């Protein structure tokens, strides 16, 4: 296969390193009450929480106590913790160290040192939106094993898309595999004609208990007109989703 033309995301462009900027950004998250997921013990445990206070002078922040005491104990024993949230479509992620227990308004809470860096992805192309089940979209791969194959889309963004494989062991979709004769009809906005490269694989368990394989792909040879088609399609899905939730 030809060499990959995919350029890795330069996270340095989206990283806050100034203590003042970090404290301000986390304060805004706390002020608006956005939900935050904390992954502890190398992802073995997690809690859903909210940031409570950010103390720039002391260099610490506090966040809500979890609902399950056993999980809270495991979080307190974790030396490295990953915080993730998406306030107003802006994905925020940072790593913090050991967490301690404190009291806030006579209630238990967690406290941690402010992180040294915060990744703040503002570019909308890195946020994928799921395609509707009622109007499935397919990617036709014309150069698959000397024939064509249609794969259903799970989600799409300007940065890439996820596709369902027809079987858990479907061959030809290892990481790094490229296909150059692909077409995707994003009705009513237009058709994409491009290449794709498999970037990751994910095993998912369906509602019926069966396992399914999903692959994440980046685009190859994405032109400006095709970017516009994707933008319009994603915007259309976002408007429909907002209308459904009122």
Curated annotation (Swiss-Prot):
Residue span(s) of domain PilZ: 122-234
A single cellular component GO annotation: bacterial-type flagellum basal body
Cysteine pairings via disulfide bonds: none
InterPro entries given in the database record: PilZ_domain, Split_barrel_FMN-bd, T3SS_YcgR, T3SS_YcgR_PilZN
Pfam families for this protein: PilZ, PilZN
Nucleotide-binding listed as a keyword: yes
GO terms under biological process: bacterial-type flagellum-dependent cell motility; regulation of bacterial-type flagellum-dependent cell motility by regulation of motor speed
UniProt entry keywords in alphabetical sequence: Bacterial flagellum, c-di-GMP, Nucleotide-binding
GO molecular function, one term: cyclic-di-GMP binding
Gene3D superfamilies attached to this UniProt entry: Electron Transport, Fmn-binding Protein, Chain A (2.30.110.10), predicted glycosyltransferase like domains (2.40.10.220)
Cell location: Bacterial flagellum basal body
Main localization of the protein described in the UniProt heading: other
UniProt family annotation: Belongs to the YcgR family.
HAMAP family from the UniProt entry: YcgR
Assembly and interaction partners: Monomer. Interacts with the flagellar basal bodies.
Main function: Acts as a flagellar brake, regulating swimming and swarming in a bis-(3'-5') cyclic diguanylic acid (c-di-GMP)-dependent manner. Binds 1 c-di-GMP dimer per subunit. Increasing levels of c-di-GMP lead to decreased motility.
Protein name in UniProt: Flagellar brake protein YcgR
The organism of origin for this protein: Chromobacterium violaceum (strain ATCC 12472 / DSM 30191 / JCM 1249 / CCUG 213 / NBRC 12614 / NCIMB 9131 / NCTC 9757 / MK)
Phylogenetic placement of the source organism: Bacteria, Pseudomonadati, Pseudomonadota, Betaproteobacteria, Neisseriales
Name of the coding gene: ycgR
């Amino acid at each position: 296969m030809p060499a990959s033309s995919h350029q890795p995301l330069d996270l340095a462009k989206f990283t806050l390193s100034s203590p003042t900027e970090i404290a301000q950004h986390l304060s805004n998250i706390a002020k608006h009450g956005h939900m935050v997921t904390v992954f502890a013990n190398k992802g073995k445990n997690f809690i859903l929480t909210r940031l409570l206070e950010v103390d720039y002078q002391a260099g610490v922040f506090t966040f809500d106590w979890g609902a399950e005491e056993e999980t809270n104990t495991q979080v307190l024993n974790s030396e490295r913790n990953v915080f993730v949230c998406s306030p107003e479509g802006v994905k925020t992620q940072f790593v913090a160290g050991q967490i301690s227990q404190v009291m806030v308004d006579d209630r238990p809470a967690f406290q941690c040192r402010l992180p040294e860096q915060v990744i703040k992805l503002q570019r909308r192309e890195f946020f994928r939106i799921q395609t509707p089940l009622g109007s499935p979209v397919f990617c036709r791969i014309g150069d698959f094993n000397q024939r064509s194959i249609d794969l259903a889309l799970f989600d799409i963004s300007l940065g890439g898309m996820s596709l369902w494989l027809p079987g858990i062991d479907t061959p030809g979709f290892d990481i790094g595999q490229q296909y150059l004769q692909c077409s995707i009809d994003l009705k009513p906005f237009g058709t994409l004609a491009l290449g794709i490269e498999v970037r990751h694989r994910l095993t998912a368990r369906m509602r019926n208990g069966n396992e399914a394989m999903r692959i994440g792909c980046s685009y190859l040879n994405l032109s400006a007109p095709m970017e516009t088609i994707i933008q319009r399609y994603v915007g259309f899905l976002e408007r429909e989703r907002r209308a459904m939730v009122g």
